[in-house]
Structures are given as structure tokens and as C-alpha cells.
Amino acid sequence: MKNKSVFIVSTEFLPGPGGIGSHAYQLAKELHKLGWQVTVFSEQGHCPDSEIEEFNRNSVFKVVRLQPTPSMALLLLKLIKLVWAAIIQRPGVIIGTGKHGAWFAVLTGKLTFTKTALIGHGTEFIVTMSKRSHKINNKVFTSANALIHVSAYTQQIAESIGVVNNNTHVIHNGGDDELFYPLPVQAVERFKQEKGLAGQKVILTAGNVQPRKGHEFVIRAMPQILKQIPNAHYYCVGPPTIKTYLEGVADEVGVKSAVHFTGRVLKDELLLWVNACDIFVLTSVATEYGDVEGFGIVIIEAALCKKPAVVTSESGPGEAIIEGITGLGIKEKDVAGITEKITTLLSNDLQRIEMGENAYRNAKANLTWSKVVKKYDAILTSLIK
């Protein structure tokens, strides 16, 4: 009988923010539905302990919260905890997601003779890491029994720095159609009234407000957007990591009254924000430290709410749209291109609505987690034969 027990070792996990944590949660939830016995090991932060405890208590699979490890002694204790759990529970496969999640997964797998599957999101292959970290990282990812990239873009980055695994796959991220779906018009209009959005053309970016998301370039495009669409407003939903800097940019270009930061919102409110927007935007960039956007789950979540997207076409998000059908692509840091694509969609209701409908149909047909997980299931099952 096959051992359908799996550990997922992640660098982050819900209920806190972060694409890797969201991906790990969805993978765990969907594998559980397919009959896998799932245990998640991860740090959990950026939200109150009470919220984390309630989340873990209500989870349908087991979540083991790991504490931050600022010292070598604590790192060793974390490894011992994982190895001991693997010895006791004997999982068939250990999945590692995020750089340190991957490192711990492979170490635990080697010490307990357990198969490993790693997931590459993009941040694991930052080219500016130290030579020592680079060497360890390459060895970890090439030695796994399977390597799954969330985009062809991520695979390209990995292979450009020497990370080549003989059992490599590309599986695009999925969206959760139980959490993201079109809401009734009345509910959306009521939310718009409550938030002061009535009469506005709403441009939305959701996720951690950090450099790689490219908020700055949308803000720099706003002066020209406002000349053509005077009622356009840009909303940045998510933890406001670089809010002060971006407010300075908005002030510099004279659009401070049209740029808004909501801070972190809970999932029910996020659903309302996505439904309330006219277009979703993710103009991500590769930062000076090599941080990149591997795919962009939020684009699929927006599509599940019938929203077209404007994204950077030369990175992972470019693989989350069908150009001209479900969204529009721009070059990295192309303020003129951002202006053109956003104004095109905001000024043409029929085109925008049609693209949103196309995005919805494509996401429902190909990119919900219930469909994506079958590809993971096939790979994991092949490892435990």
C-alpha cells in the first residue's frame, strides 16, 4: 500500500501574508481532499498570536508552528524537531517550499531516507546571495527527487544559475474558487459606498506592499492616467511595508489624493476589494537584490472575480494572463506602457468586461486549485511507488 503521508515544510504560512504561505496552504488543503495525510511545518507571523492559534485549531490538517531561528543552536533544534517527526510519522514524501523550507526538507529527507519534492517560486534563486549560500542552494535543489517550478520564468532563472534537476516540472499556481468568486452587484455597490469608491474607476494591487510588486511605477503613471481618466484611483491592499516611500513618490508626482493604502485586510474584505475594482494590476520588477515575482496567484484570484489584469509580461505574471484575451502585458518599469494599458481598459467598458469574462472562464477551466493539485498528486504518487 502506498504511503500517502506528506510533510510540507514552508518558510511562511497562513494566516499571515505572503504568496509562498498561501500556496503552501492551498496545496495542503487540496492534497488533504485527495486523501493525503498532511502535516505542515512552518513559521507563522505578521498577525496576532490569537489569530494564528485559532487558524491552526480549525485547520483540517495538522499545522506545527515553528519559531524563528536567529541562531545556529535554534536552527539545529528546528532540524532535530523535523527529523524526529519524520522518524515517528514516516511520511512518504517531504515537500519543501521557499528557500529555507527547501533546505530543511532536503536535510530531513537525507537523514531519514525520505523522498523530497521542492517548489521553486523565484525568491529561492536570488543571484545576489553569498557564494556559500549559492553553493548550498544549488546542491539542495539539484539533489531533490523532484523540482516543481511555479512558472517557466522561475525555471529559467534557476537554470541560469546552475540549478538543474533531472526531474523538473512547471505547474502554474492555482486560485481558490471557494474564496474568490463574483459577488452580487448589490453587495459590491454597498461596499463601494462604505469605502467611498462610488463613481471611481478603481485600479487595484493586492499583496505585500514591497519593492518587487512594482507599485511605484503605477503611481508614476497616475498623472497621465488622470489626464485621461480623472476619476481613476489606485488602491494598494496589503501590509504597508514601503508605504512611506510610496507616499513620497505619490506626493512627488502630485497624485497623493488618488493613491490609497488600506493595510492588511482579512480574506472576506479582500474578496470585496477584488470585486470592487475595475482592473487588477501587478507591474512587478526584479529588484536590485534579485528578488522576483515567480507567478502571481493574485492575478488568478482576480480572474475568478471576472477582473482583467495589467501585468509585467517578461516575468512570472506574464504567464498568468493570455495576452489580449484575459489581460494586457507591459515591459518592466515601463511607465508609458502602464499608462497606455490602464487607460485603454478603463476607457473601454465593453473590452474590459469581455476580458474579465475571458479571464474568469480560463481560470475556472484551467487554474483552480482543484485542477492544479492533480498535477502535484501525480508527481508525489510517482515518488512513493
Placement of each model-derived feature along the sequence:
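Short hydrophobic beta-strand element within catalytic cores of glycosyltransferases
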Residues: 299-311, 321
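Short His-centered aromatic/hydrophobic patch
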Residues: 96-102
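Nucleotide-activated donor-binding/catalytic signature segment of Leloir-type glycosyltransferases, i.e.
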Residues: 246-269
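Conserved acidic donor-binding segment of nucleotide-sugar-dependent glycosyltransferases
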Residues: 313, 322-324, 328-335, 344-350
